[in-house]
Amino acid sequence: MAWTKHQLFLAGLMLVTGSINTLSAKWADNFMAEGCGGSKEHSFQHPFLQAVGMFLGEFSCLAAFYLLRCRATGQSDSSVDPQQPFNPLLFLPPALCDMTGTSLMYVALNMTSASSFQMLRGAVIIFTGLFSVAFLGRRLVLSQWLGILATIAGLVVVGLADLLSKHDSQHKLSEVITGDLLIIMAQIIVAIQMVLEEKFVYKHNVHPLRAVGTEGLFGFVILSLLLVPMYYIPAGSFSGNPRGTLEDALDAFCQVGRQPLIAVALLGNISSIAFFNFAGISVTKELSATTRMVLDSLRTVVIWALSLALGWEAFHALQILGFLILLIGTALYNGLHRPLLGRLSRGRPPAEESEQERLLGGSRTPINDAS
């Protein structure tokens, strides 16, 4: 069945805003500007402040939810139920995981390429599958285990591509390796977040936009408060600011004042995450979970292609191979091969409802699927 203009718009919005989210964060990292007190020109490395901005974008989803709820008042078939009771503190543990994982990923993005960052995030399938078996009592089928193995193989290939690629003075080999490992570590935390959301949040049938906004509120408030002690905690060579501390928000604002384009990149990152979450939820509702996963894979291609075009990274054939293997792993884990096999065997393809149930039940996307 042909897509409507509304569905095409939602798919395009998800693809564009998802790509902007990662690329704008990397664009901000690439800027050089003077900091406070006449400090020398240095790169904009403020991952924790960027994470605060991302949570601000997620927090804005609460406004979208209440707008939808006001619009849906009096409609009996509305999915936005104003009477849904839930305890907001249920979102605190997933929000803490989201805060930790997001901060790690922003630190890693300073060290590695945007395309590797996006591809290595596919590792979440491995840990989600293992944790769902251990803590949710789920039994994985053969195709899901094969998907996990394929994902591991794809991660190895992408890692080899990073090792064999030429590295400039900004991204030394040791930093690239550290960045890649931090991304993998972050996916463990994201997988824990997904398990917590499924165990404690999904059963309350909270609207996804409300869930995203509530987690964003917790993350924004907590991480904003943590910026104060981070200003004084020494981090040595791990730090990217002249004072050598874990985070220097004042230095970041001084750099933004001296290079206004950094503000453009940060605003792009903040706004894109809000629209990306809204578009992703809408695509799953209007089309299918399969479509959302295909678009997410296309997002990786767009990020990789634009990074090459902008000269942010060098071409390496192993990255293509690694991405294809990761794509196969994702497809196997989420059962995307079954409709294809059904058509090849001239069987009746499964209905869209059962497809959504299988995909969302087998591997839920985190409520706030960031960059």
Swiss-Prot record:
One of its GO terms (molecular function) is transmembrane transporter activity. The keyword Glycoprotein applies. It is found in: Mitochondrion; Lysosome membrane. SUPFAM superfamilies: Multidrug resistance efflux transporter EmrE (SSF103481). Pfam families: SLC35F (PF06027). Keywords: Glycoprotein, Lysosome, Membrane, Mitochondrion, Phosphoprotein, Signal, Transmembrane, Transmembrane helix, Transport. Residues 347-371 are annotated as: Disordered. Residues 104-160 form the EamA domain. The modification Phosphothreonine is found at T365. It is a multi-pass membrane protein. The chain crosses the membrane at residues 48-68, 89-109, 117-137, 140-160, 176-196, 216-236, 261-281, 295-312, 317-336. The keyword Transport applies. One of its GO terms (cellular component) is lysosomal membrane. Its main location: mitochondrion. Glycans are attached at N110. Interacts with SLC25A5. Involved in the maintenance of mitochondrial membrane potential in pancreatic ductal adenocarcinoma (PDAC) cells. Promotes pancreatic ductal adenocarcinoma (PDAC) cell growth. May play a role as a nucleotide-sugar transporter. Belongs to the SLC35F solute transporter family. This is Solute carrier family 35 member F6. It comes from Pongo abelii (Sumatran orangutan). The gene is SLC35F6.
